[in-house]
């Protein structure tokens, strides 16, 4: 028997298909997306198993942006990070890696580090904040690598301050253990940290970046670091089935995101701060306050089913999609969503967004 939540999901899906305006990421028909890729493709020849074409050009662009000697394009970030951590473990002769308890590696990857690579996870903390040097120091013995996710998505998109990140990186160097940055949203982190991509990446041995989130690529990721490490990562990419015959559509879309969306990071961050203030004036709460990136959590003083019903009804009547599905918060009677400020968000006025959200509480 269908539940109220099931009915709301079905209604939301149907309403979304009829929407004509989106606050974050619009729905683009497949045919239109393919035409867009045709218009922006720069290379005449496709890559073959990652060699030449847009893939090779993208790898060089990423290496240059991050100030690293080499980079490799991969179909997924999961594969990229598993591969580099496996390389570090094999080199160090230990299977222990230090990870945040809320990191993507542990929350969303079905224990792949343990199940596939037999790595042992040492949790520095599971608090919704970045790990501290003393928490790393509390883990005894030899470590293969330390990972930091910038920002920590499941902690609320939280970042360290620049000084905190520098001190943490120094603690890794003093211990003689490689620091790996999970930079799935690193592009979005530069305004808050106040430093360039290369300056941030210089604090770590290797860095992973994603192309399909704010940059709007089809899919895919890149890993940047020393040439010898990247060469070994390429071998693991092959072993894990990620060295596809050609990946040029993904690389074309990634390069277009670097050209057109990356320059907007400052504007997106500023709009996130403005929206967080406006939403609070409508009775919502936000975390972190102010936001650290273009993404943050919005909390509503209503039960999830109540405000979700209002959100779906608004989608049905206005054909506007302003938020994702509301989820129950830890506090009874409250609910929350993630709000991502994307390029299309800049087409909305701040007071227009605040009014739209306010309607959900006054429904």
Feature annotation, model-predicted:
Residues 2, 283-363:
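Conserved C-terminal alpha-helix-loop-beta "cap" of PLP-dependent enzymes
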Residues 7, 22-76, 90, 101-107, ...:
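Conserved N-terminal alpha-helix of the aminotransferase class I/II PLP-enzyme fold
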Residues 87-145:
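PLP-dependent aminotransferase-like
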Residues 120-121, 179-180, 286, 323:
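Hydrophobic beta-strand scaffold residues
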Residues 129-183, 188:
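Active-site phosphate-binding strand-loop segment of PLP-dependent enzymes
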Residues 136, 190-198:
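Distinct, well-ordered alpha-helical segments
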Residues 154, 159, 202-302:
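Active-site C-terminal subdomain of aminotransferase-like
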């Amino acid at each position: 028997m269908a539940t109220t939540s099931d009915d709301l999901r079905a209604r939301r899906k149907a309403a979304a298909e009829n929407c004509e305006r989106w606050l974050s990421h619009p729905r683009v028909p497949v045919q239109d997306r393919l035409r867009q890729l045709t218009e922006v493709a720069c290379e005449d020849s496709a890559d073959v198993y990652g060699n030449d074409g847009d893939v090779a050009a993208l790898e060089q662009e990423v290496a240059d942006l991050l100030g690293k000697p080499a980079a490799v394009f991969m179909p997924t970030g999961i594969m990229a990070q598993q591969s580099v951590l496996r390389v570090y473990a094999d080199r160090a002769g230990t299977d222990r890696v230090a990870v945040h308890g809320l990191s993507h590696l542990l929350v969303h990857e079905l224990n792949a580090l343990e199940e596939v690579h037999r790595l042992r996870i040492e949790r520095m903390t599971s608090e919704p904040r970045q790990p501290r040097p003393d928490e790393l120091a509390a883990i005894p013995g030899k470590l293969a690598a330390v990972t930091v996710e910038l920002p920590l998505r499941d902690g609320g998109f939280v970042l360290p301050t620049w000084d905190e990140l520098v001190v943490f990186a120094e603690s890794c160097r003093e211990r003689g253990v490689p620091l790996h940055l999970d930079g799935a949203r690193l592009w979005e982190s530069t305004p808050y940290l106040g430093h360039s991509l290369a300056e941030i990446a210089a604090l770590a041995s290797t860095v992973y970046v994603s192309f399909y989130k704010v940059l709007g690529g089809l899919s895919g990721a890149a890993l940047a670091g020393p040439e010898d490490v990247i060469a070994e990562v390429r071998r693991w990419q092959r072993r894990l089935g990620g060295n596809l015959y050609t990946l040029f559509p993904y690389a074309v879309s990634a390069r277009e995101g670097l050209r057109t969306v990356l320059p907007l990071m400052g504007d997106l961050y500023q709009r996130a701060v403005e929206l967080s203030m406006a939403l609070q004036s409508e009775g919502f709460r936000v975390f972190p306050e102010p936001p650290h990136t273009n993404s943050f959590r919005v909390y509503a003083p209503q039960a999830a089913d109540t405000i979700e019903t209002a959100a779906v009804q608004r989608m049905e009547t206005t054909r506007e999609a302003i938020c994702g599905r509301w989820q129950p918060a830890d506090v009874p009677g409250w609910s929350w969503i993630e709000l991502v400020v994307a390029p299309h968000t800049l087409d909305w006025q701040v007071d227009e967004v605040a009014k739209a959200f306010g309607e959900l509480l006054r429904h």
